[in-house]
């Protein structure tokens, strides 16, 4: 992988990630394909929304279908017929989400399978081996996602263990002679000094990119912004910066303003299946009866397949009848909305008009533009 940085405005960055399987323009949003599929979508449909890269889930793909079946197909690209870049998370967040059915030790994590209750052990070495079998273009280190709330001492112990796991991930990745890219994950909770210690330790080990983890786990939005403002300018400028698991459209806008290059989140797809649709004027709840006889498209500014061909009334009808097509059309629209947002942000950085773009983004939804500190490096 090669990262090219074209231009900046304030801390916002316009660039690209170049892989053998294709180029990803940044800032970029990655749709989530947990089980090797973006729910309800074919790879061709996902690509048509403008997505250049997908996120796959190491933990779930390890449990089903497993490494053996994956290797029989070649890798995840061949298994799901997506021949563009794929980033896989390490499984750390999913283990974190298991709560009481897992036990974390220095060696790794013991837990029971959420599928059949089988006892399973996952450690940094195994995570690297699974991601190697997936053929991931970007491999994430195995870490512990520091929960919120956590005391500073709890966050320190968690972060320092993640650093030790980062070294083990690096060592196993190198032992496997994996030709792809490995990203480190910055932890430390809401504590700036711990974030600094984490980043410095990761830079000493050496990675191809750096993710900010342990955010969007329940902390106030102000804390997320504060941590991003603190840590992003300290990440080596020639490496991509990835904010994991974020988020709402406004989170992408605010992340880009603070120097983030990559995002992922289940929100556009999950919300689509629940009838919450993103538009240039805000969120539409298609289940609301006021859409029953509305012949207008979801968003007259949107160029997606759904908006070009179907009315709000039709989408309301599909939802009321619980038709699968409704969830699919909603997903196409929400994914395209996210990609159009990223296209707009990239264009605004290129032309030096990011402030105007951000103002239009908020005012078109009847919202005030949030105040931010002067963000310059």
Curated annotation (Swiss-Prot):
GO cellular component: cytosol
One example of a Gene Ontology biological process annotation: tRNA-guanine transglycosylation
Binding site for substrate: 89-93, 143, 187, 214
EC number(s) reported in the record: 2.4.2.29
UniProt KW Glycosyltransferase keyword: yes
Catalytic-site annotation from UniProt: 89, 264
Residue numbers binding Zn(2+): 302, 304, 307, 333
Keyword field: Glycosyltransferase, Metal-binding, Queuosine biosynthesis, Transferase, tRNA processing, Zinc
InterPro entries xref list: ArchSynthase1/Queuine_TRR, TGT, TGT-like_sf, tRNA_ribo_trans-like
Cofactor: Zn(2+)
Gene Ontology molecular function terms on file: metal ion binding; tRNA-guanosine(34) queuine transglycosylase activity
Protein's pathway: tRNA modification; tRNA-queuosine biosynthesis
Annotated stretches, region: RNA binding: 245-251, 269-273
Keyword Protein transport: no
Catalytic activity entry: 7-aminomethyl-7-carbaguanine + guanosine(34) in tRNA = 7-aminomethyl-7-carbaguanosine(34) in tRNA + guanine
Top enzyme category: transferase
Family from the record: Belongs to the queuine tRNA-ribosyltransferase family.
Known function: Catalyzes the base-exchange of a guanine (G) residue with the queuine precursor 7-aminomethyl-7-deazaguanine (PreQ1) at position 34 (anticodon wobble position) in tRNAs with GU(N) anticodons (tRNA-Asp, -Asn, -His and -Tyr). Catalysis occurs through a double-displacement mechanism. The nucleophile active site attacks the C1' of nucleotide 34 to detach the guanine base from the RNA, forming a covalent enzyme-RNA intermediate. The proton acceptor active site deprotonates the incoming PreQ1, allowing a nucleophilic attack on the C1' of the ribose to form the product.
Subunit structure: Homodimer. Within each dimer, one monomer is responsible for RNA recognition and catalysis, while the other monomer binds to the replacement base PreQ1.
Protein name: Queuine tRNA-ribosyltransferase
Organism encoding this protein: Shewanella halifaxensis (strain HAW-EB4)
């Amino acid at each position: 992988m090669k990262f090219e940085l074209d231009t900046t405005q304030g801390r916002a960055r316009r660039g690209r990630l170049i892989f053998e399987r294709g180029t990803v323009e940044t800032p970029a949003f990655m749709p989530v394909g947990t089980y090797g599929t973006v729910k309800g979508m074919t790879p061709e449909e996902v690509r048509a929304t403008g997505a250049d890269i997908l996120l796959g889930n190491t933990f779930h793909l390890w449990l089903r279908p497993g490494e053996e079946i994956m290797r029989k197909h070649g890798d995840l690209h061949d298994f799901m017929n997506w021949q563009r870049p794929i980033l896989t998370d390490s499984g750390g967040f999913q283990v974190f989400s298991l709560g009481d059915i897992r036990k974390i030790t220095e060696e790794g994590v013991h837990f029971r399978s959420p599928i059949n209750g089988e006892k399973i052990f996952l450690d940094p070495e195994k995570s690297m081996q699974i991601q190697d079998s997936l053929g991931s273009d970007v491999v994430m280190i195995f870490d512990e996602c520091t929960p919120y709330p956590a005391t500073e001492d709890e966050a320190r112990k968690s972060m320092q263990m993640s650093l030790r796991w980062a070294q083990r991930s690096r060592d196993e990745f190198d032992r496997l002679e994996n030709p792809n890219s490995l990203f480190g994950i910055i932890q430390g909770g809401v504590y700036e000094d711990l974030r600094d210690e984490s980043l410095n330790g990761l830079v000493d080990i050496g990675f191809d990119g750096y993710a900010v983890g342990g955010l969007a786990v329940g902390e106030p939005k102000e804390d997320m912004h504060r941590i991003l403002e603190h840590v992003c300018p300290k990440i080596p400028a020639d490496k991509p910066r990835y904010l994991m698991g974020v988020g709402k459209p406004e989170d992408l806008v605010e992340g880009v303003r603070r120097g983030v290059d990559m995002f992922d989140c289940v929100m556009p797809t999950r919300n689509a299946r629940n009838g919450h649709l993103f538009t240039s004027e805000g969120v539409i709840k298609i289940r609301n009866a006021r859409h029953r006889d509305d012949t207008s498209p979801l968003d007259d500014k949107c160029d997606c397949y759904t908006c070009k061909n179907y009315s709000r009334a039709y989408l309301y009808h599909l939802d009321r009848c619980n038709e699968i097509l409704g969830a699919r059309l909603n997903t196409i629209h929400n994914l395209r909305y996210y990609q159009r947002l990223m296209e707009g942000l990239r264009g605004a950085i290129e032309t030096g008009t990011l402030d105007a773009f951000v103002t239009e983004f908020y005012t078109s939804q009847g919202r005030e533009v949030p105040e931010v500190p002067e963000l310059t490096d």
